[in-house]
Amino acid sequence: MTTVKFKYKGEEKQVDISKIKKVWRVGKMISFTYDEGGGKTGRGAVSEKDAPKELLQMLEKQKK
């Protein structure tokens, strides 16, 4: 499976693309929420140029 690597509050993280719930664009950044498990929702962002193509495809699907 594809993973998204990002920094959140100075901490390096990575999340499996299948856990991502919602994706949106903020300028040249792609922001997203994901399921952390235990009923928690995590947040992350990655630059458009560093985003995996699967994340960009999710963004396009949500626009429709």
From Swiss-Prot:
Hyperthermostable. It holds the Pfam family 7kD_DNA_binding. GO terms for cellular component: cytoplasm. Transmembrane segments: none annotated. It comes from the Archaea. One of its GO terms (molecular function) is RNA endonuclease activity. InterPro entries: Chromo-like_dom_sf, DNA-bd_7a-e_arc. Keywords: Cytoplasm, DNA-binding. Its main location: cytoplasm. Highly stable from pH 0 to pH 12. Gene3D superfamilies: 2.40.50.40. It is found in: Cytoplasm. Belongs to the 7 kDa DNA-binding/endoribonuclease P2 family. Can constrain negative DNA supercoils. May be involved in maintaining the integrity of the genome at high temperature. Monomer. NCBIfam families: Sul7d. This is DNA-binding protein 7a.
